[in-house]
Structures are given as C-alpha cells and as structure tokens.
C-alpha cells in the first residue's frame, strides 16, 4: 500500500473538483483565450464565488462509473461500465451534456446502448465515426480509475480504457489511458516529467496524443518561462480549427501538457494556467487538478482553493 493512500485519494478528488470549479465560469465558447486574458488577467484564485456548485458531468462520470465495481466485484469491462451507464444515468436530466445524437458523444453512446448496441461497439469509430469517438470525454471521466491504482499506471490505463470504450475510441482512448496512468504514477512521485512519462508509456508513440505532448515539451524546454507563447503555438498547430466536433481531445490534451509543464509541480499554478488557456477549461483544470492533487497532497493545496468547497459535492444521476 502506498503511504498516506487515503489522504492522497482525498487530495486528488479535491484537486479535481477545485479545478472544475475554477474553470467552469469560463467554459462557454465565447470565453476565448483573448477574452479571459482581457477580463481576468493573471488568474490567481477563483473567479466566481459559488455558494453552491451544481452537479457537473466531469464529476458525475468518475463517481458513478465506479458503481461497475460495486455491482460486479470484478475489474471493469466495457460491458459492466455500460450497465452502470444504464443503471445510474437518467436520460436527458443532469449527468451528461445531452447535446443530441451525433453531436454529444455521451448522448450518442447512451442511445446506442438503449437501442441494443452493446459496448464497446456503442462508442466505436465504426459505429459513430472518428470525429465523435475522439471528443474530450475519453479523458475527463476517468480520474477515479487512476485513484484506484496507486503506483500502477499500467493497470490504471487498462481500467480507464475499458470504461472509456463505452463511448470513445481512437485518440479518445489514448487520453483515457494517459490521464489515468499519470494519476496512478503521482502516488509515488511528485516529479511532473516522471508522471507524464508514465502516461506516455501507456499510449502509442505514433499517436497524435503523444505528438502534442512531445511538441509542448520541446517548446517548454526551449522557452521555459513563456507559457503564453506555448499557448500561441498550440493555437497555430493544434487548435480547434484543425479537428472536427464540438470539443476534440487533442487541442485540450495540448493544454493539459502545457499546464503540467509550466505549472512545474505547483498545484495552484497548474490549474490556473489550464484555465487561462481557454478551450474546455473545467475539464482540463479538473484533469490536471487530480494529478497535482495526488502528487502534492493536502499540504500542496492552498486553503483559498480548498476551504470554499466545505467538503460538499453535488451529484446527479
């Protein structure tokens, strides 16, 4: 057992929820990178005071999909996680972004399951097309699989991919494997390069996902103080205009790579940079928040971020 395992799980879960809460106000598409910079400048704390934070799909997924373990007592499979989808998600109400068939990856997969299309076919490129299968949901619902596998990135990646295959395929699965592996590795090291190396070891090196991490890493090595320059590079070479769908995983993977590199192991700075980069702000800050929460532990999470949560979490199923 990893020393202080319960505390690190708690810190990781706090980190995820803090990142989501920080990024949520600027998630809507009209909050461009330029607008966030103009309105908020250098973010150094919450930009909105929530008395209560509503249920969020980025939290629902990691919590409810774990029911597959409770219900079966076995390692997750696409089939067992698909059954958890059907058992615990109420169609059209809360839980996911119910954006419509062929628009929302999760809505499409859910309707596939209801119509008798089993997992993993329900989330496959063959069934839904590449654009839908490679949206960001592949990596944003998998945090708890990493929390379950301390110090074992390979097992975390396997669990995450099994769960993600209900709704995603291709690069979406690489994102699932990467994020879960990073979280698992963060239990045994706080060195960001070691953490990301563990994640990259679980995905094909010829993938776009690995390529964007390498390019961000190379830019950081050449310009270690210029995260905004790195963001401009992402816009030019890996931006939303290059990928189909509402919220593709690759540009947002680039933001996570940037935030992890330039955050340099500091919890607060990592989630702040992820938020200032725009695109899917709550998802990206949530993912890196889990990784850094585990790596830094409770002592590394500033009270100004932790205290407003008051250990309160709202879910919707």
Describe the role of every protein-language-model region.
Residues 1-317:
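Structured, active/binding-site neighborhoods that engage oxygen-rich ligands
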